[in-house]
Design a protein with these regions (language model features):
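Short, surface-exposed recognition loops or helix-turn segments adjacent to catalytic cores
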Residues: 223-224, 228, 535
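Extracellular/oxidizing-compartment recognition motifs
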Residues: 15-223, 235, 251-254, 271, ...
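Residues embedded in well-ordered secondary-structure elements
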Residues: 3, 84, 150-152, 228, ...
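Active-site core of glycosidic bond-cleaving carbohydrate-active enzymes
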Residues: 232-545
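Bacterial Sec-dependent N-terminal signal peptides
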Residues: 1-16
Length: 545
């Protein structure tokens, strides 16, 4: 089935990258480590979390009392409080208490819970059914000794903080003296200046986009500062696009590109899907084909923004390895990526992701389009760094892959992209068929309009997939449709009170979670939702009028 496999096996019998080469990449990543900026915040108001069927996930925060009372009135009598910092923050939290009756004569015990959104403090924690570590939840038992101070040992991501006194002395009394949230980010000042004519909803969407990216920009581009606190390659591409449009902190992008290269599989040259920065940078041993290809897109965006040819040349072998491994191992004699379950030798686990979906998503059309799209970006990189001779066969291969994809997945009669043996119609398959040029012009416009009319079509499950749908709309000239979609989807989160954009937003099911339905594991500041700022800045004729 697979062309050139034996040739590839011979090629990778030796190391793709030397130990010295990868060590050099890791050193360059360390040299590009950004400065972390810190800002001190204090609670702005005391709130109560109340039920509201119209609110996101059925709960909202309502101002009660005066925040000043927290620092003068007995907390032993009050017993419980929820404070609001006024915005979504990432960083270190500490608090102090002071005696207002007899001196403290016993350790004080508190239960403290942090929430990104009001429902984080209202939904039941137990029984825990989430598919990931319960340690991601931000609920703590805190013992305050005689010095009256406490600092959380781990980084916190939250807007709201609930404090409950669960162990106090009968012989002393106390109030809070100080509650401090020291926020962190590697983002600087935004370079965005929107036209005065920009509709308010898009100004708000741009602001929330920047907030999302700001809080995800730490030592690397994290996917979510609450959970998972790691660099995923798919998120990296979208964060890099948003950064180029806003903060322009290119050292973060450069660091991430070098970290991933330095941690790649040295024998086959493939990039692992994600890496964790602490305690020392290390990769998780999984291979997402679409994410590995997105590395090429990220490097191309970085080169366009910075003109850093030296980095482009340095990482060029990584670019070629991702593309040529896929071409040599996974493309059949008909020019199709025909087995999306293919397991790449040397990788513990291989998959094609594209989106979380409640219904199994067929990714054949999507991966075909992405491969073509990636090869075109690789050609752009080659032109910038002077390596076009190494990819002189790419244009012919692109033509072949496009033709194969159109023959296999384009139903010219119905004007639909139909993926795989089951002929599945999905927004994601349609988006990537357009982005990869498998269909274009009027056909592309018809494909988007028809998939959106099809009640059986598989809709996007995440902001990640929705980004590429909007890009496909813009690429084929459906500018008003793109504008409306951003306003409805990301604007929907804004209207529900989002400070930062969420990991999931399913308009007709606010409690959706891919973690066995356990909503408290969801992230409410997630990198793959930060890209409206990219659209708003780069398409002013669409979004700033």
């Amino acid at each position: 089935m697979v062309a050139f496999l034996s040739m590839y096996q011979i090629m990778v019998s030796a190391q793709c990258y030397t130990a010295d080469q990868q060590q050099s990449w890791l050193q360059k990543a360390e040299a590009a480590k950004p400065t972390i900026k810190k800002t001190i915040h204090h609670p702005l108001q005391e709130v109560s979390i109340v039920k509201d069927v119209e609110a996101f996930q059925g709960y909202k925060a309502v101002k009660v009392g005066d925040i000043k009372d927290l620092y003068i009135q007995s907390f032993k009598q009050k017993k419980e409080v929820v404070v609001d910092f006024g915005e979504h923050l990432v960083g270190r939290v500490s608090f102090k208490i002071k005696d207002i009756g007899g001196m403290q004569d016993a350790v004080l015990r508190f239960k403290v819970t942090f929430g990104e959104v009001p429902s984080d403090l209202a939904l039941p924690v137990e029984p825990y059914t989430g598919g990931l570590s319960r340690g991601w939840l931000q609920d703590f038992i805190c013992d305050v000794s005689y010095d009256g101070s406490f600092q959380f040992s781990r980084r916190i991501t939250a807007r709201y903080m609930k404090i409950e006194a669960i162990g106090t002395s009968a012989y002393s009394d106390f109030c809070f003296d100080n509650i401090t949230f020291e926020s962190t980010t590697s983002a600087g000042l935004s370079k965005v200046k929107l036209a005065d004519s920009t509709p308010m909803i898009f100004k708000d969407i741009a602001r929330v986009s920047e907030n999302t990216l700001r809080d995800c920009m730490q030592g690397v581009y994290e996917d979510g500062p609450k959970r998972d606190q790691r660099l995923w390659m798919g998120d990296l591409y979208l964060e890099a696009l948003a950064n180029t449009a806003s903060f322009q902190q290119y050292d973060v992008t450069k660091r991430c590109l070098y970290l991933l290269a330095g941690l790649a599989n040295p024998r086959n040259g493939l990039l692992y899907s994600n890496m964790v920065e602490y305690p020392t940078p290390h990769a998780q041993n999984s291979f997402f084909v679409d994410y590995a290809l997105s590395y090429v897109l990220t490097l191309d965006d970085y080169l366009k923004a910075t003109g850093d040819v030296a980095t482009g040349l340095d990482l060029w072998p990584v670019v070629k390895n991702q593309i040529e491994t896929v071409l040599s191992q996974a493309i059949d004699q008909n020019g199709l990526y025909s087995n999306t379950s293919y397991q790449y030798p040397g990788m513990m686990f291989s998959t094609v992701f594209f989106d979380w979906s409640p219904v199994a998503l067929d990714n054949h059309a999507a991966i075909q389009g992405l491969l073509v799209y990636t090869m075109e970006h690789a050609l752009d990189i080659a032109k910038r760094i002077g390596t076009t001779a190494e990819v002189k066969d790419y244009p012919a291969q692109v033509k072949r892959l496009r033709a194969a994809g159109k023959k296999a997945y384009w139903d010219a009669k119905q004007k639909l992209v139909l993926s795989g043996k089951e002929k599945q119609n999905s927004y994601t398959g349609t988006s990537w068929a357009i982005l990869g040029g498998i269909i274009s012009g009027k056909d592309a416009q018809s494909a988007i309009k028809n998939v959106m009319r099809n009640p059986k079509a598989i809709k996007p499950g995440t902001p990640y997939a929705n980004h590429f749908l909007v890009q496909a709309m813009l690429n084929c000239g459906l500018k008003q449709e793109a504008k409306d979609y951003v306003e409805q989807y990301w604007g929907g989160m804004v209207r529900l009170g989002a400070d930062t954009f969420w990991e999931y937003y399913v308009p007709d099911n606010h409690l959706f979670s891919s973690y066995n339905g356990y909503t408290l594991l969801n992230s409410y500041c997630h990198a793959w939702s930060c890209t409206p700022i990219y659209f708003i800045v780069n398409y002013p004729e669409v979004f700033q009028k």
